[in-house]
């Protein structure tokens, strides 16, 4: 009630969604049902015209099952062009488009190639042919549809980055739905170059110029008290029940995708070998436990491959190398606690853990140790783009980041762009505390720039995010966001 009363404004501005053309940039992991249901809601409330972009022709049947007409679909597929004999890439075209749209092809390709070893073997010419085809198809699509907005839920593939770069260069607004790491709140981002949310920057800049009023202070302090050392996960809005029914549904969805693709995924390891390896490593001596009374800085490992590192932390993707730099920069009376991620510990490449464990002042901590307690007792938290940084802010702990993440806009965060400056940054932040008053202002800015609702993928929240109530929340939030960001 307090939040709604404090931040909800009656905006009498023009309806920025009515009669607009939307391009829905679809993808896997539950994005399709969220986007199709949200599109239907906007069609009924704001009379939008929806088009759907897919990068796989196998999804044709899937979209049919959602009631989407094929004349509303745009498919971009590389198979035909790659089968053309004697085809060579147009190098002049590629260079011209890199300049025109502001990206480097092999920078973006890394997002794709790092996911499977087989992709690293794709020839140079084939990569350029794929990119050339993708760029041309997007240009044709934009010319034919002329969308007003493009909507994405997390960019995780190289096509998503190309789409974003091209559409923004062509004057088309790209809206990304975001989970702001505040339970039952959502926001949007239309500046994915830096991962700094424009509305958050706007609200935080205003708050820095004044004192908090009593109600704002109360809300921010209650949020810190409610946090109380609990972790905020992207799917934490609704507890995910793992039942026989949910397991069956998961495997049914997998089987449906395989059926439409008419081929197995590139690797069956996630389904067959990794669950066995999980159990073996859980009880192995590879990982250590924290030691009482030991001073340490904390670095939680990221899941890889993932957009958090391949896109937003691309200069620091080699985590063992980054940990080695941290180990060289920390005073000799401190250890570095490197905690493995509970969802990634059995899927690391060969030699990954060995590189970390051979550093004498580093402990490789078990993935099952409580992350929040590690942050709470650390002298410093270092992360590329992790949620651990946001959680540490709430505990007024010092944080150093290396990548692009929303909380970098907070004045108390130290972002290291030049690794040669890391030693000085650690010395500056080690064993300090974040000013609580500044923390309360940043939390207030977070609330002021977010909206009631759930941005979690349906499969992670028992489909609550596609309930009628939540879809209405997203639509209202989108309208308010666009009005406020343009005012």
What does each of the following model-derived ranges do?
Residues 15-29, 151, 301-304:
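Nucleotide-activated donor-dependent transferases that construct or modify glycoconjugates
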Residues 3-7, 40-138, 179-278:
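Conserved N-terminal ligand/cofactor-binding loop architecture of enzyme catalytic domains
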Residues 136-198:
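Conserved nucleotide-sugar donor-interacting segment of glycosyltransferase catalytic cores
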Residues 291-327, 340-343, 447-454, 458:
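Active-site donor-nucleotide binding/catalytic segment of nucleotide-sugar enzymes
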Residues 152-153, 367-414:
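A donor-sugar binding/catalytic signature common to diverse glycosyltransferases
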Residues 324-366:
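Catalytic donor nucleotide-activated moiety binding site of glycosyltransferases and closely related
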Residues 198-247, 414-487:
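Leloir-type glycosyltransferase catalytic cores
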Residues 55, 114, 179, 297-306, ...:
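Short loop/turn segments at strand-loop or loop-helix junctions that form parts
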């Amino acid at each position: 009630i307090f939040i709604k009363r404090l931040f909800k404004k009656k905006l009498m501005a023009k309806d920025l969604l009515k009669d607009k053309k939307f391009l829905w940039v679809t993808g896997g992991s539950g994005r399709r049902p969220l986007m199709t249901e949200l599109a239907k809601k906007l069609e009924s409330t704001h009379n939008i015209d929806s088009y759907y972009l897919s990068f796989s022709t196998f999804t044709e049947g899937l979209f049919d099952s959602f009631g989407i007409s094929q004349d509303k679909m745009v498919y971009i597929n590389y198979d035909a062009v790659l089968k053309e004999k004697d085809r060579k890439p147009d190098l002049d075209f590629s260079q011209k488009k890199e300049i025109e749209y502001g990206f480097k092809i092999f920078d973006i390709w890394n997002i794709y190639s790092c996911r499977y070893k087989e992709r690293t073997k794709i020839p140079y010419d084939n990569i350029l042919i794929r990119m050339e085809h993708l760029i041309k198809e997007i240009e044709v699509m934009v010319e034919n549809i002329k969308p007003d907005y493009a909507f994405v839920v997390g960019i995780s593939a190289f096509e998503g980055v190309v789409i974003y770069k091209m559409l923004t260069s062509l004057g088309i607004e790209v809206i990304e739905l975001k989970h702001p790491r505040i339970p039952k709140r959502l926001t949007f981002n239309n500046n994915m170059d830096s991962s700094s949310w424009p509305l958050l920057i706007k609200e935080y800049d205003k708050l820095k110029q004044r004192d908090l009023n009593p109600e704002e202070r109360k809300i921010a302090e209650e949020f810190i008290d409610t946090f109380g050392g609990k972790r905020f996960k992207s799917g934490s809005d609704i507890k995910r029940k793992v039942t026989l029914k949910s397991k069956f549904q998961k495997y049914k969805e997998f089987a449906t995708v395989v059926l439409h693709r008419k081929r197995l995924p590139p690797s069956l390891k996630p389904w067959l070998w990794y669950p066995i390896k999980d159990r073996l490593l859980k009880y192995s001596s590879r990982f250590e436990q924290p030691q009482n009374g030991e001073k340490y800085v904390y670095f939680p490992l990221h899941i890889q491959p993932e957009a958090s590192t391949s896109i937003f932390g691309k200069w620091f993707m080699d985590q063992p190398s980054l940990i080695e730099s941290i180990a060289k920069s920390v005073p000799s009376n401190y250890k570095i606690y490197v905690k493995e991620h509970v969802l990634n510990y059995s899927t690391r490449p060969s030699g990954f853990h060995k590189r970390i464990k051979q550093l004498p002042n580093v402990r490789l901590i078990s993935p099952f140790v409580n992350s929040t307690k590690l942050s709470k007792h650390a002298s410093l938290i270092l992360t590329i783009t992790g949620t651990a940084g946001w959680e540490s802010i709430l505990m007024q702990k010092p944080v150093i980041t290396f990548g692009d993440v929303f909380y970098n806009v907070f004045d108390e965060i130290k972002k290291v762009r030049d690794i040669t400056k890391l030693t000085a940054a650690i010395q500056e932040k080690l064993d300090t505390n974040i000013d609580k008053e500044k923390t309360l202002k940043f939390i207030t800015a977070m609330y002021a720039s977010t909206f009631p609702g759930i941005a979690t993928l349906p499969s992670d929240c028992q489909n609550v995010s596609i309930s009628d109530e939540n879809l209405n929340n997203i639509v209202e939030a989108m309208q308010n966001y666009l009005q406020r960001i343009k005012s």
